[in-house]
């Protein structure tokens, strides 16, 4: 990529209009070009036949449309596709999950992750950097181009590699493009951001954009959560859920409820007492609960619970009146299931990041 060229995938609609106004063009040119990029998957200015030739030539000189390239593709027996995408010498993974009534894309927000959750393969790879807007929306662009068809992607979940709320400055514009009518036109109820509990950033998020929220809870008490999710030492369950309720108060995309993600680790957090504890801790936070049977990966001490343990846990929660879904494992034969995304983090700097988080607090850049 040329350093002197602007990658148009880095610009949401406001930024794109400002770009064209700076060129002396009318703002509607931005809308025209966005339709070519996102509706038609076009990355060649010469094909944009409703843009005059003089402007096309100028755009070729100063701009580009460059999405991450696929370095590897794996297709699961259940239809799931996992792509490893090149992002500046590193790799991130993106997963496409087709179902009868929808097609969901699981998108990464960082190269690696700094939060070190003990049950997640991504966390074991270390942390390198935040992804740029073009590298986030570019995952959607690349997947839509490969899959093809009229509505190749109906849902996007920011549940790939990384903690999205530690990259708000790039994640928010990318999500705007997902929902923009000149982008992918996906409903805000079908764009989901997931967080492990970066509470100050959750408050910022609610002031910036309205999307569906999922939270990675994974334990019903602070002692256990801190053991498996170190971020709990900084923002405990009570603080986290208070932040969630504040977000729900600002949001129309969630129907008043948050999705609680709870990975079931055999004989760690899946006892009946844990289910009762979870119901009690969530009593003031309107929730639907996604139970995720653990997906094993090499070198990890945790196991997947038996079906009977999963059923018992689920039934306890339903007795309290919660909507409970046991997530169907998809793509586990190609390591594309929840918690298995790795990519290739070449430069591991997670210790530096962890130290900085402990010393200075978790820093959040905002748009």
Swiss-Prot record:
<keyword id="KW-0004">4Fe-4S</keyword>
<keyword id="KW-0479">Metal-binding</keyword>
<comment type="function">
    <text>Specifically methylates position 2 of adenine 2503 in 23S rRNA and position 2 of adenine 37 in tRNAs. m2A2503 modification seems to play a crucial role in the proofreading step occurring at the peptidyl transferase center and thus would serve to optimize ribosomal fidelity.</text>
</comment>
<feature type="active site" description="S-methylcysteine intermediate">
    <location>
        <position position="338"/>
    </location>
</feature>
<keyword id="KW-0963">Cytoplasm</keyword>
<keyword id="KW-0408">Iron</keyword>
<feature type="binding site">
    <location>
        <begin position="216"/>
        <end position="218"/>
    </location>
    <ligand>
        <name>S-adenosyl-L-methionine</name>
    </ligand>
</feature>
<keyword id="KW-0808">Transferase</keyword>
<dbReference type="GO" id="GO:0005737">
    <property type="term" value="C:cytoplasm"/>
</dbReference>
<dbReference type="InterPro" id="IPR007197">
    <property type="entry name" value="rSAM"/>
</dbReference>
<dbReference type="InterPro" id="IPR040072">
    <property type="entry name" value="Methyltransferase_A"/>
</dbReference>
<dbReference type="GO" id="GO:0030488">
    <property type="term" value="P:tRNA methylation"/>
</dbReference>
<keyword id="KW-0489">Methyltransferase</keyword>
<dbReference type="InterPro" id="IPR013785">
    <property type="entry name" value="Aldolase_TIM"/>
</dbReference>
<protein>
    <recommendedName>
        <fullName>Dual-specificity RNA methyltransferase RlmN</fullName>
        <ecNumber>2.1.1.192</ecNumber>
    </recommendedName>
</protein>
<dbReference type="InterPro" id="IPR048641">
    <property type="entry name" value="RlmN_N"/>
</dbReference>
<comment type="similarity">
    <text>Belongs to the radical SAM superfamily. RlmN family.</text>
</comment>
<dbReference type="GO" id="GO:0002935">
    <property type="term" value="F:tRNA (adenine(37)-C2)-methyltransferase activity"/>
</dbReference>
<dbReference type="InterPro" id="IPR004383">
    <property type="entry name" value="rRNA_lsu_MTrfase_RlmN/Cfr"/>
</dbReference>
<feature type="binding site">
    <location>
        <position position="194"/>
    </location>
    <ligand>
        <name>S-adenosyl-L-methionine</name>
    </ligand>
</feature>
<feature type="binding site">
    <location>
        <position position="113"/>
    </location>
    <ligand>
        <name>[4Fe-4S] cluster</name>
    </ligand>
</feature>
<dbReference type="GO" id="GO:0051539">
    <property type="term" value="F:4 iron, 4 sulfur cluster binding"/>
</dbReference>
<keyword id="KW-0949">S-adenosyl-L-methionine</keyword>
<dbReference type="GO" id="GO:0000049">
    <property type="term" value="F:tRNA binding"/>
</dbReference>
<keyword id="KW-0819">tRNA processing</keyword>
<feature type="domain" description="Radical SAM core">
    <location>
        <begin position="99"/>
        <end position="333"/>
    </location>
</feature>
<feature type="binding site">
    <location>
        <begin position="162"/>
        <end position="163"/>
    </location>
    <ligand>
        <name>S-adenosyl-L-methionine</name>
    </ligand>
</feature>
<dbReference type="GO" id="GO:0070040">
    <property type="term" value="F:rRNA (adenine(2503)-C2-)-methyltransferase activity"/>
</dbReference>
<dbReference type="Pfam" id="PF21016">
    <property type="entry name" value="RlmN_N"/>
</dbReference>
<dbReference type="InterPro" id="IPR027492">
    <property type="entry name" value="RNA_MTrfase_RlmN"/>
</dbReference>
<keyword id="KW-0698">rRNA processing</keyword>
<dbReference type="GO" id="GO:0046872">
    <property type="term" value="F:metal ion binding"/>
</dbReference>
<feature type="binding site">
    <location>
        <position position="117"/>
    </location>
    <ligand>
        <name>[4Fe-4S] cluster</name>
    </ligand>
</feature>
<dbReference type="GO" id="GO:0070475">
    <property type="term" value="P:rRNA base methylation"/>
</dbReference>
<feature type="active site" description="Proton acceptor">
    <location>
        <position position="93"/>
    </location>
</feature>
<feature type="binding site">
    <location>
        <position position="120"/>
    </location>
    <ligand>
        <name>[4Fe-4S] cluster</name>
    </ligand>
</feature>
<dbReference type="GO" id="GO:0019843">
    <property type="term" value="F:rRNA binding"/>
</dbReference>
<dbReference type="Pfam" id="PF04055">
    <property type="entry name" value="Radical_SAM"/>
</dbReference>
<keyword id="KW-1015">Disulfide bond</keyword>
<keyword id="KW-0411">Iron-sulfur</keyword>
<feature type="binding site">
    <location>
        <position position="295"/>
    </location>
    <ligand>
        <name>S-adenosyl-L-methionine</name>
    </ligand>
</feature>
<feature type="disulfide bond" description="(transient)">
    <location>
        <begin position="106"/>
        <end position="338"/>
    </location>
</feature>
